[in-house]
């Protein structure tokens, strides 16, 4: 399926971004299929230079922030090999294939999939404490602002889900859009850092998964990495099974999960190792950021909780205000522009809803909106911006969500 002529065209993974205007850049696209090992090898071969660029960046970032060598980081990541193998052996096989295809070590790929867990691991904080025994200052949670809009919040009657994915600018050129064909499981479309097996996206069953880091350190019992949990959620064929994964799985770190389905339903779960909180939309609109909105977990409240990303307190209401205009939309084209405009808000710049690098910080600590995504769960179209949405048009991906298992007659809307 070719991209619409009015949209940015996709480029193969591993290609250099276009020179000149950065707004003309498109995200690389990768499609994989076959057995888990075959899928992994296809993926690794396609993103080989991007994966090695990501490894180089995180080696520098961990070295600068914690004084750790990459060997120590992978040694920490090895803690997750056994639990992931027990929970999802097919994903370990996929990671093994990625490593083979990219010419990397399995623990390198595992570290990329557990980078958040390494950062927020309680024992990691202890081994990186200074000589006085003080742990390092907790890093801000992975920044994102997610939304779901349907029913009275959507003037054209479509079901929308998406987010601004804010993370370190140094990995911007390692982000790819991946389509995973894995029957009988649903086909997935996700935005990921090269080598990751899961992050955020949507599937052919009409389920969208958007996520936000929440921060806070809990106990040091081993839980599953977010990439594995999120991939498992998107592997489900209905909303109840997707929720079941989140409620029955103990993740290692806290993360917010916003689930939206094509039937016109959404629920938000603030998942933590200590328990979950949940929220429902108000009049069809739900927005979540990087602070606890359903309730602060008791262990964090007892310790005097303060949001690790104070700008989230601004981003959430600004997104709500901007997306309120969607209820008056008369058609999908207008809706998409209203959403892009809402997600381009700059109040509090540079740490705004549309995030830009802060020139006051060292380059390795620069944050930016890596991708602004929009899934139309009514039509199955998936749109993204390759960077900040304020100065870019949506890139129309060359796939439809409903070209896969569970995407047949029960899907709402029509396929383009």
Language model features: what each stretch is:
Residues 229-235:
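Short, well-ordered beta-strand elements within core beta-sheets of diverse protein domains
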Residues 115-228, 370, 382-384, 391-392:
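Internal mixed beta-strand/loop scaffold within catalytic domains of large alpha/beta enzymes
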Residues 2-143, 235-276, 282-416:
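C-terminus-biased signal that marks the final domain/tail of proteins
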